């Protein structure tokens, strides 16, 4: 387990109620985005960087409980941060991380249409991809049947060759190595319990508590909130009540598939307009094992058993998968794992919600990164560049 020097040294102060350490930059949250930001800003030798993580290891929540897809950047409004930073992040992953040994594969993706309405949707995505200069192409039906005989696509197949898969842990471990090679630190098992801003000192004080009851007060000139599911909660510790945000949680269950029909690429159904997910899709891991998900299940709170797969969702997922993979058998599917999407809007709100990455008025040096759901893993290095430019 990777632990920072801060955590190890703080345990030496067993008789003291507080330990104080100063950094130029403090990042809250050691998921894919927090580690990427920590790595990026640590490249400046004038920066002393600390990344704080409440769990005992980095990347234990949304960053590792997802489809592990390198997204092309096709689905979101052209002028959105999701589109801009997904495309940039994809390029950085392929250009930088692949050369450094991060485990990944450029397997490509098909989006399949089963009716006229879905065909029109694919045409719009294809036109948008031209505007974004992201490669897509329609696959002739005879060629599609030759390449993937198990897949049903009654009306059309849109190919996205720049889509891939990546080991989230391999990617995060690479970012952590960059951070630590630049003398940055990761503090695990350290939950943020309070935030204050000193106008006179022009610095932030971060109150941190460990599982064994040890407390620390850490100061930093710049504070970056990348707490994922808990980002609104962290932001609300600092901002006045009228600027508080509510967190919403959209659970996604994944189901593993027993067998190997030889499918070689990711298969996505056409998304349903106004629904907060891309549909129950077919993804592959780096070993070629198939899985299906995520579905969409709204949960009210993050309970201890929130990550337990909801087996009641197996048959609905099976029915969705059958639409594009008709030979799938129910007995070949079983619950695998689940993840939680950090949402800033609830189930009843249908409009698009972009990433929220911004400076906060009245709090110089404080940057919020909230609502970082899909394509957050792909966009993580793009987000890091964006945040670095905000500083």
Regions found by a protein language model. Give the residues of each.
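Helical element adjacent to the flavin cofactor pocket in flavoenzyme catalytic cores
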Residues: 158-221, 381
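Dinucleotide-binding Rossmann-like beta1-alpha1 core, especially the glycine-rich loop
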Residues: 68-143, 147, 154, 280
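C-terminal catalytic lobe of FAD-dependent flavoproteins
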Residues: 308, 312-391
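N-terminal mitochondrial targeting presequence
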Residues: 1-22
């Amino acid at each position: 387990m990777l632990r920072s020097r801060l955590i190890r040294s703080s345990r030496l102060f067993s008789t003291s109620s507080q330990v104080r350490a100063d950094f130029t930059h403090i990042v809250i949250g050691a998921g894919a985005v927090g580690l990427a930001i920590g790595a990026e800003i640590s490249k400046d030798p004038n920066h002393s960087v600390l990344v704080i993580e409440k769990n005992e290891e980095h990347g234990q929540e949304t960053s590792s409980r997802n489809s592990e897809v390198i997204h092309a950047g096709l689905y979101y409004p052209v002028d959105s941060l999701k589109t801009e930073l997904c495309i940039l992040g994809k390029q950085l992953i392929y250009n930088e991380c692949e050369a450094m040994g991060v485990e990944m594969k450029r397997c490509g993706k098909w989006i399949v249409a089963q009716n006229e309405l879905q065909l029109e949707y694919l045409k719009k995505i294809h036109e948008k991809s031209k505007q974004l200069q992201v490669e897509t192409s329609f696959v002739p039906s005879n060629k599609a049947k030759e390449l993937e005989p198990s897949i049903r696509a009654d009306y059309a197949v849109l190919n996205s060759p720049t889509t891939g898969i990546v080991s989230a842990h391999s990617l995060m471990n690479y970012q952590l190595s960059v951070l630590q090679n630049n003398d940055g630190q990761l503090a695990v098992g350290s939950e943020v319990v309070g935030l204050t801003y000193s106008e006179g000192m022009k610095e932030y004080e971060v109150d941190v508590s460990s599982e064994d009851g040890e407390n620390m007060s850490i100061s930093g000139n710049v504070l970056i909130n990348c707490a994922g599911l808990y980002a609104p909660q962290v932001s609300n510790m600092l901002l006045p009540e009228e600027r508080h945000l509510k967190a919403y949680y959209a659970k996604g269950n994944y189901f593993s598939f027993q067998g190997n029909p030889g499918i070689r690429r990711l298969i996505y159904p056409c998304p349903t307009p106004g629904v907060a997910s891309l549909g129950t899709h077919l993804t592959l891991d780096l070993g070629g094992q198939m899985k299906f998900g995520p579905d969409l299940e709204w949960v009210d709170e993050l309970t201890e058993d929130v990550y337990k797969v909801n087996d009641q969702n197996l048959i609905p997922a099976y029915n969705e998968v059958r639409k594009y993979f008709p030979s799938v058998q129910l007995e070949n599917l079983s619950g695998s794992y689940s993840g939680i999407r950090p949402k800033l809007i609830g189930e009843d709100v249908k409009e698009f919600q972009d990433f929220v990455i911004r400076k906060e008025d009245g709090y110089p040096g404080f940057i919020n990164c909230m609502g970082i759901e899909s394509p957050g893993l792909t966009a993580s290095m793009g987000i890091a560049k964006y945040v670095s430019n905000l500083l």
